[in-house]
Design a protein with these regions (language model features):
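N-terminal catalytic or cofactor-binding beta/alpha core of small enzyme domains
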Residues: 1-146, 151-266
Length: 266
C-alpha cells in the first residue's frame, strides 16, 4: 500500500494536507509511550473538510496515510530548524510531543540510521509525488498553485500564550507566491468577521510552502494554519470531535480562498 494518496484534478491547484495521517506501524507503536497512540498532535479531520472542496473545484489532493509521529512531511530532509533560535517545535522524526514530553519509551528513540530509513520510506515518496504533480500542473496550465492545509489546537500554552487567531495565512513573508495572491487572500480574510485572522504572523509557512513556493518559476504556494475550534469541539476527544455545524461555517470561507487563488492569473 502506498504511504500517501494522490488524486489528480483538472485545475492548476494542488491541496496538500501533510499532517492528517494517523497510521503508526506496529513495530513503532510498541516503542512509543501509550499516550502517543492517540496521535494528539494530528491535524484532525482536516481531510474531511478539504476533500469535498477539492472534488467540487476539480483540485488535486495529496494526503499521507502515516502519522507525523512517524515522519514530519513539513520539515526539510536535512532536519534544519525552520525558525532558527526559536524554542519549541518538532523535527523531521519527532521524539517529543508539542508539549515537549517524550514520545518514546526510555531507550527506544530512533538513531540516525532509522531516521534515514524513514526519510527514504515515507518522506521521499510524498515529496516526489507532490513535486511531480506540481510539474504536471505547470505543464498543463502554465502555472501551479499549492495550498498547504494545517490545523492546530487553539491553545498550546507550552508553545505560545493565549489563543491563536482562528486563521493563520502564511506566504513566507511574501516570498512563496505572487504579491497579488497574498493581497487577494489577505483582503478576503480581512473582509469577513466570523473568524479572527492574521497574515504572516506566527505561522509563515513550513518547509512545503517555502520549498515549493517559487513564483519566478510559475509555482505559487500558501499555507493556512487553522485553529481546530473552527470545525471541531476542542473540549472532546479529538478523534470524534468533528462538528458539522462549525465546519459548515468554515468550509465556505476556505472554498472562497481556493477560488481566489484559481481566479488569479499571472
Amino acid at each position: 500500500m502506498s504511504v500517501f494518496e494522490l488524486r489528480q484534478g483538472r485545475v492548476p491547484l494542488l491541496i496538500s494536507l501533510p499532517h492528517v495521517g494517523t497510521q503508526i506501524p506496529a513495530e513503532l507503536a510498541e516503542r512509543l509511550v501509550p499516550r502517543a497512540l492517540a496521535s494528539e498532535d494530528t491535524d484532525w479531520h482536516l481531510e474531511r473538510l478539504y476533500r469535498p472542496l477539492a472534488d467540487k473545484l476539480g483540485a488535486s489532493l495529496i494526503v499521507p496515510r502515516y502519522s507525523r509521529y512517524v515522519i514530519d512531511l513539513n520539515r526539510p530532509p536535512d532536519d534544519q530548524p525552520l525558525y532558527p533560535g526559536a524554542s519549541g517545535g518538532t523535527g523531521l522524526v519527532p521524539t517529543r510531543f508539542f508539549s515537549d514530553d517524550p514520545l518514546y519509551r526510555d531507550g527506544a528513540e530512533p538513531d540516525a540510521t532509522e531516521v534515514a530509513a524513514r526519510r527514504e520510506a515515507y518522506w521521499l515518496p510524498y515529496h516526489q509525488a507532490l513535486a511531480g504533480e506540481l510539474e504536471r500542473l505547470r505543464a498543463a496550465h502554465g502555472h501551479a498553485l499549492l495550498f498547504d492545509g494545517h490545523s492546530i489546537r487553539s491553545e498550546l500554552p507550552w508553545l505560545f500564550e493565549g489563543q491563536l487567531p482562528a486563521l493563520n495565512l502564511g506566504t513566507a513573508d511574501g516570498a512563496s507566491c505572487a504579491p497579488a495572491i497574498t493581497e487577494r487572500l489577505g483582503a478576503l480574510l480581512a473582509g469577513q468577521t466570523r473568524f479572527s485572522q492574521v497574515v504572516n504572523g506566527r505561522f509563515k509557512g513550513g518547509y512545503i510552502t517555502r520549498h515549493y513556493g517559487r513564483p519566478a518559476e510559475g509555482q505559487h504556494a500558501v499555507q493556512l494554519e487553522m485553529c481546530q475550534r473552527c470545525y471541531m469541539d476542542e473540549a472532546c476527544d479529538p478523534s470524534g470531535a468533528y462538528d458539522e455545524a462549525l465546519a459548515g461555517q468554515a468550509a465556505p470561507l476556505i472554498e472562497k480562498m481556493l477560488k481566489e487563488m484559481l481566479a488569479w492569473q499571472p
